[in-house]
Amino acid sequence: MKQSLLVVAGLLLVSAATAAEPRQLFVAPQGNDHWSGRLAEPNAARTDGPLATIQAARDAIRGIKKTTGLPPGGVVVELAGGRYEFAEPVELAAEDSGTPDAPIVYRARPGQKALLTGGRRVVAWSPVTDPAILDRLDPAARGKVIQADLKSLGITEYGDLGLDPAWELQLRLANVDHQGEDAMGSTFASVGKRVRPRLEVFFNDEPMCLSQWPNQGFIKIEEVLGPTEIDVRGVKGCKEGFFVYEGDRPRRWVGERDAWVQGYWFRDWAQQRHKIESIDLDRRVMRVAAPYHTYGYRKGQWFRGFNLLSEIDVPGEWYVDRDRGVLYFWPPQPVERGRVEVSVAPGFFRLTDASYVTLRGLQMETARGTAVTITRGAGCRVVGCTLRNLGTHAVTVTDGKEHGVVGCDMYGMGGGGVYLVGGDRKALAPAGHFAENNHIHHYGRWERMYRPGLFLSGVGLRASHNLIHDAPHSAILFGGNDHVFEYNEIHNVCNESHDCGAIYAGRSWTLRGHVIQYNYLHHLCGKDGGPCNGIYLDDLFSSATVQGNVFYQVLRPVFIGGGRDNLVENNVFVDCPKAIHIDARALGWCGPHADGRIKEALEKGTLGGVRYREPPFSTRYPPLVNLLAEDPKSPRGNVVERNIFWAGSGEDIRRVQFGAPPTDVWWDSIAPKIRALVKFEDNLINKDPKFVDERAGNFQLRADSPAWKLGFQRIPFDKIGLYQDACRASWPVRHAVGPMPQPVPPKAVKKTPSRKK
């Protein structure tokens, strides 16, 4: 075996030695776009040297290709360490492509940090002296808040505070008409007008907070007053944003130039921002400006005010007077000892129809939009980059083939992390896009809901070995067919939502072929300890394979919302109340949704727009063919086998939470009327599985585990999560694991150290 490995290694060395060397171009902050870019440093006469911008390097490559053709080894553009300021993204088109054997690579010089920034430094500060402004400031902020003239920096456009295109689930409420999944199999809808990405403020590379109140938590709605009542399965509210608020704090907001509120107005998983139209101080009544929230408003929901000069009351908050172009800021420390930047550029790279282009080892930060967008093309890579402090997403990929995001660190996004969309769903032809070995965390800073760390939609995409944590909503959202999710670690997400999932998909019988395996999901509880799911297959989602996963302290690890043909096997559940949930919602409140799909199938021969009884769907997913003849509303075909359900060696979490003795009944939550439809086989329930070291978080099984006799297969737990290689942006990787809040009692929660990668 060793001899074989040596032979292979030798062949690889020979291959590497004979491969054509790439042509090199150099870029440096002190370069000159009139130079050739063939020298890494300026010559003695300073007549030649590196280029100053990536755009000039791109143009030089275009010239090379026109005169002598693409070099056999491709081209490497090496960026020296230093700061590169962007006003607009670099545009790369089909003419800027490489080939599989001769790629175009833009990379940082080894050992140096090439910092691409869309920010502008703000250095000219002065104290606030205007009596009218001082009068509006919180007493604690007077003398602490400073101001800067953004117009003097040429910054006159500040973006919008209103609704971004918001990904929201359709027909989770009965009063929303279902439109069906789109061509890529996504059941998420883009609602609202497109807006200009907004300016943000950063201090010493940390995002600061647009002034808000409360600084933590929310204000409750005490009563709704809108004239148009709504009733969603007994949950009552109104359509208009007209309500009584608790407390008296909004009294301070009267007279604000541009006051806004952001709230969860009807459901805990759907937010929207509104401009305040009026406040009646005597009645404590607020009206918000239309358009109103999609789902309406109801008593007991929560909101906060923002963009309020009067609410700069703690260090780190800021406000922009958009009419005068003045930034007001309470710095966390004396501003002369720090660095203040405001975001200006929309992003850094925009690839359209480009192929075989790699961005490697670059640090991209402080932009209003998405750092890298890739549209169509093939074989492009974002490798080992750090993408942070972005207004929207880190990387988006739309269409094309085999694009990849590998080994990146991504955090501080206003939206999500990596969005992968591609493949031909009608033909079930895979795109082959992938996200691997990325560390994605602290995202959803601005768009709180449905901005996941990873979003996959289409056919044949893969997410593997990613570490995702600390977010208000989901880690992974997906739609389409034939995706693979494996070796990912997820914790402490869904922190500001109820009824959500760390991994979520929903609402179709045809979104089949997905494999969710060898993932570690832990410390997931939702807002205030409310309902949160590990893997959430919502509203009739069908035919996922959930195997070899480890769930630790997840309130509801696997949730099947009335779907069919799902396989849950060979998983480990530790300290997880109601480890498996399967309901029959299509036989009840979700019946109208199912009826709509059945009607579509009978009248058009399609389900969700696809011809499910014809190839390729009929051959790839045979159970679809006879779906209508097999009581489609019933959750048939679900299998739960060879799983380990263990309350843990500490106090039984289920007994404490549900007030019942630790009997087998509490390991699941299956609707009684459909329990006979679910196949249960060879599960190990509340019998010590004999983990190697449970308290240290090692859930491998010892040789004497009783699970082996049931046919349990080894889970490669040691391979889950990030791994070290030349493509990783950083190593080691440390991440703190947050504790489980109430209602889970502290004595039922064991301390789990962060996993050092």
Segments predicted by a language model, with ranges:
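Bacterial N-terminal signal peptides
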Residues: S4-S15
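Extracellular polysaccharide-degrading/modifying enzymes targeting complex plant/algal/animal polysaccharides
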Residues: P22-R376, R381, R388, T396, ...
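Predominantly extracellular beta-rich ligand-binding scaffolds that present long acidic/polar faces
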Residues: A87-E95, D101, V105, S543-P557, ...
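Right-handed parallel beta-helix
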Residues: S355-E365, A378-G391, K401-G415, A427-G444, ...
